[in-house]
Amino acid sequence: MTASEGRVRSVTGRVVSNKMDRTIVVAIERQVSHPLYGKYIRRTTKVLAHDENNECSIGDLVTLHASRPISKKKAWTLGAIVERAV
């Protein structure tokens, strides 16, 4: 067993769309340093995630876990809803 097999990769992000059936779009923000000036810049990545029970709404803060590919673009599953939208 290698070191990466024992732990499931997880990320936290905000739900930006839930219009699809059992699928949510999650925006994951990260900060990167500008190569020349050193200022930290926000970068956003959008990923599709599987929401089996359609329980997420727009604005929720969620945790995603990596999984086997479910479709062409979807390889994440909903782990937990950390914070509900107001």
Swiss-Prot record:
GO MF term list: rRNA binding; structural constituent of ribosome
Sequence intervals crossing the membrane: none
Alphabetical GO biological process terms: translation
Pfam families in the record: Ribosomal_S17 (PF00366)
Role summary: One of the primary rRNA binding proteins, it binds specifically to the 5'-end of 16S ribosomal RNA.
Matching PANTHER family: 40S RIBOSOMAL PROTEIN S11 FAMILY MEMBER, SMALL RIBOSOMAL SUBUNIT PROTEIN US17M
Similarity section: Belongs to the universal ribosomal protein uS17 family.
HAMAP family in the record: Ribosomal_uS17_B (MF_01345_B)
Name the record gives this protein: Small ribosomal subunit protein uS17
Organism: Methylococcus capsulatus (strain ATCC 33009 / NCIMB 11132 / Bath)
